Amino acid sequence: MEKLTLSPISRIDGEINLPGSKSLSNRALLLAALAKGTTQVTNLLDSDDIRYMLNALKALGVNYQLSDDKTVCVVEGIGGAFQWQNGLSLFLGNAGTAMRPLAAALCLKGDTESEVILTGEPRMKERPIKHLVDALRQTGANIQYLENEGYPPLAIRNQGIFGGKVQIDGSISSQFLTALLMAAPLGEGDMEIEILGELVSKPYIDITLAMMKDFGINVEHYNYQRFLIKGKQYYISPQTYLVEGDASSASYFLAAAAIKGKVKVTGIGRNSIQGDRLFADVLAQMGAKVTWGEDFIQVEKSELKGIDMDMNHIPDAAMTIAITALFAQGETVIRNIYNWRVKETDRLTAIATELRKLGAEVEEGEDFIRIQPLALDKFKHAEIATYNDHRIAMCFSLIALSDTSVTILDPACTAKTFPTYFSEFEKISKNQ
């Protein structure tokens, strides 16, 4: 297995131009494909998850032109439901941002009835999709499980979704609601969605609603508990769509600065539609100096103190706080993060396990993690298992800000969202 050893870094300094956001990139491609008109999507992320979406769209008959550097895609919209030859199978890797929205969109009524199979890597077959399938079936969708009940692979027939009242569980993942919301306007009737339980990761729903609006569709909602969507509508291309920089990816550079230097990230700012921009506010609460601009966030180090906080609204960026906690004064508790357990891997167990290898004192609860700080000279060298999870690899790069080196196993797993992460991290790492 490939491994990468990072030597201790004495300070962090520089500017990072962020790659496009994964969740915005795949939403933009799908909306552009379903829309009337041609859309030029710019600052598209070039990564594995985006390639799975692009390959699926091509197989579904969508024409697009991708620039040589893969960051600009001109998509010719089909102006409605997908059409395909019966018996199509789409392999989506471990891309939740492709699997969930496509599962809903492929239920829309086609001109001729066809079946499609959605499948992926072994880990994808362990990632729950039951809440979405249950909701789609309430609207009349025809979906079957091919292996284990509640998990991909799925067989879907394009017999239509017919609106009406739908209940969906919001407690595990906001991607299920996102998928339903994006498909609903093209359905055969008006839909009223009621959320069961507490909706997790609300800011990701804000992203979905903002993007649907950019493509001409308005959704009414009542305090994130009920959503009303008119059926028989069309998405209209905005002609161009700029994908914001990835706020989750910004978290590693901003945290590095809070621990040991100063960094400016460009591509997101105070008006970003991504909830993970709020990560910078968490760093500020821990004591870091944060400056906001229209299209940048700058963080400068200061003495950090531990925090006790509900981070349900920023689950991806919260992982970075788990590492930052080692460098703070006093314990840190990250709460209400059960959905870490259904991501690329069970992130709660994975992070607790790898932190302990470094010598950290960690308590792992069902939906929280409690972390005690470590003195810079008390970190143990460790080989960090990454569980084929891009965010674990990027998080643990920050351990090099201690007095000891760290070895990251399978560093190439960052290709899911940020193939050039380690070279960008190296650019801001100073050793004099």
Curated annotation (Swiss-Prot):
One GO MF term = 3-phosphoshikimate 1-carboxyvinyltransferase activity
Q: Name one Pfam family in it.
A: EPSP_synthase
The domain of life for this entry's organism is: Bacteria
Q: Where in the cell is it found?
A: Cytoplasm
Recorded GO CC terms: cytoplasm
User: Which catalytic residues are annotated?
Assistant: D316 (proton acceptor)
Q: What is the first-listed, main subcellular location in coarse terms? A: cytoplasm
EC number, UniProt record? 2.5.1.19
Which reaction is this enzyme known to catalyze? 3-phosphoshikimate + phosphoenolpyruvate = 5-O-(1-carboxyvinyl)-3-phosphoshikimate + phosphate
Give the UniProt record's GO annotations in the biological process aspect.
amino acid biosynthetic process; aromatic amino acid family biosynthetic process; chorismate biosynthetic process
In its keyword annotation, does this UniProt entry include Transferase? yes
Q: How does it assemble?
A: Monomer.
Stated role: Catalyzes the transfer of the enolpyruvyl moiety of phosphoenolpyruvate (PEP) to the 5-hydroxyl of shikimate-3-phosphate (S3P) to produce enolpyruvyl shikimate-3-phosphate and inorganic phosphate.
What is the protein name for this chain? 3-phosphoshikimate 1-carboxyvinyltransferase
